[in-house]
Swiss-Prot record:
Enzyme class: transferase
Gene3D superfamilies hit by this protein: Aspartate/ornithine carbamoyltransferase
Positions bound to carbamoyl phosphate: 58-59, 108, 136, 139, 264-265
Keywords noted in UniProt: Pyrimidine biosynthesis, Transferase
Name listed for the protein in its UniProt record: Aspartate carbamoyltransferase catalytic subunit
Gene this protein is translated from: pyrB
Enzyme Commission number, as recorded: 2.1.3.2
Keyword Secreted: no
GO MF entry, a single one: aspartate carbamoyltransferase activity
Catalytic activity: carbamoyl phosphate + L-aspartate = N-carbamoyl-L-aspartate + phosphate + H(+)
Family, similarity comment: Belongs to the aspartate/ornithine carbamoyltransferase superfamily. ATCase family.
Species name: Endomicrobium trichonymphae
Binding locations of L-aspartate: 86, 169, 223
Subunit comment: Heterododecamer (2C3:3R2) of six catalytic PyrB chains organized as two trimers (C3), and six regulatory PyrI chains organized as three dimers (R2).
Function field: Catalyzes the condensation of carbamoyl phosphate and aspartate to form carbamoyl aspartate and inorganic phosphate, the committed step in the de novo pyrimidine nucleotide biosynthesis pathway.
Upper taxonomic lineage: Bacteria, Pseudomonadati, Elusimicrobiota, Endomicrobiia, Endomicrobiales
Length: 312
């Protein structure tokens, strides 16, 4: 199995067939985690470079572990000690790394579209690890897989996204994937943090969490970006907590088997209470584990372009 593309730039333009191919490929990689030796030689001789212009704990380390478990060589570029601080352009940085025979380049950037710029200029496979407010496709995929693993289906699932939908690249990747796989999606948050016209995608909009949380199968809680308060997009942290924190009391309003998810890092006591984060309904740590297996699958399914390859 493979994807019919060399890059993973987002989920908006990834078809249902490719999404299902990824879901079907994750299980065998996850089964390696229970073995004493967790490595396979699938990518031996390949070089994976991570290029993160923004901070990351989970995503960068997850990609590194995934690549190493596939026996790839991994190079982490430290932006603040590289030529980037001397003004080197994104394309020149990418071409330099490709000249060093990098096969995969995993990039996180504050600029929406930065991975696409590299994909159009390089033969290496480009994987978007988060670009501005645009997308975070592997987070969307690991969230999708976690739901699939726990609920045994995606079609017909009722999924609620809570919080800052407007600025969340995680929300956007979740929405694109879930729409294509047939889930019913709802969002809830302050009106200033809900995108206009999101209902045109078939997404139901709520502003009352107590109402929205009833009858859903999955609650995916997004990190509230506290800097948004300075932009007057919500009045105060205290008011946000009162209206939108997922608490034990609100969890009791949902179905008994509702999944509680969070992409991390969590602001305990703000968007989610500690009781809920540590509850049996929470699968937050399982999301992290699944992220490694999902990223292993993505690395194996993409097809880097062979420069100067002869035609058949």
């Amino acid at each position: 199995m493979s994807l019919n593309c060399k890059d993973l730039l987002g989920l908006e333009h990834l078809g249902k067939k490719d999404l299902q191919t990824i879901l079907d490929s994750v299980g065998p990689f996850k089964s390696l985690f229970t073995r004493s030796v967790k490595k396979v030689p699938t990518l031996v001789g390949k070089t994976v470079v991570t290029l993160f212009y923004e901070p990351s704990t989970r995503t960068r380390n997850s990609f590194e572990i995934a690549a190493k478990r596939l026996s790839a060589d991994v190079v982490n570029v430290t932006v603040n000690t590289s030529s980037i601080v001397k003004g080197e352009s994104l394309i020149d940085t990418g071409k330099t790394l490709e000249a060093m025979k990098a096969d995969y380049l995993i990039i996180r950037h504050s600029l929406a579209g930065a991975p696409d710029i590299l994909a159009r200029n390089l033969n290496a496979s480009i994987i978007n690890a988060g670009d501005g407010f645009h997308e975070h496709p592997t987070q969307g995929l690991l969230d999708l897989y976690t739901m699939y693993e726990k609920k045994k289906k995606i079609e017909g699932l009722k999924v609620l996204l809570v919080g800052d939908i407007l600025h969340s690249r995680v929300a956007k990747s979740n929405i694109w994937a879930l729409i294509k796989m047939g889930a019913e999606i709802a969002v809830v948050g302050p009106p200033t943090l809900i995108p206009s016209n999101i209902e045109d995608l078939g997404v139901k909009v709520y502003y009352d969490l107590n109402e929205a949380i009833k009858k859903v199968d999955v609650v995916n809680i997004l990190r509230i970006q506290l800097e948004r308060q300075q932009e007057n997009l919500f009045p105060s942290v205290h008011e946000y907590v009162e209206l939108y924190q997922v608490t034990e009391e609100r969890l009791a309003m949902a179905k008994p088997g509702v999944l509680i998810m969070h992409p991390g890092p969590m602001n305990r006591g703000i968007e989610i209470s500690s009781d809920v984060a540590d509850s049996p309904n929470a699968v937050i740590n399982e999301q992290v584990t699944n992220g490694i297996a999902v990223r292993m699958a993505v690395l194996c399914l993409l097809k880097p372009k062979r420069k100067n390859a002869s035609s058949d």
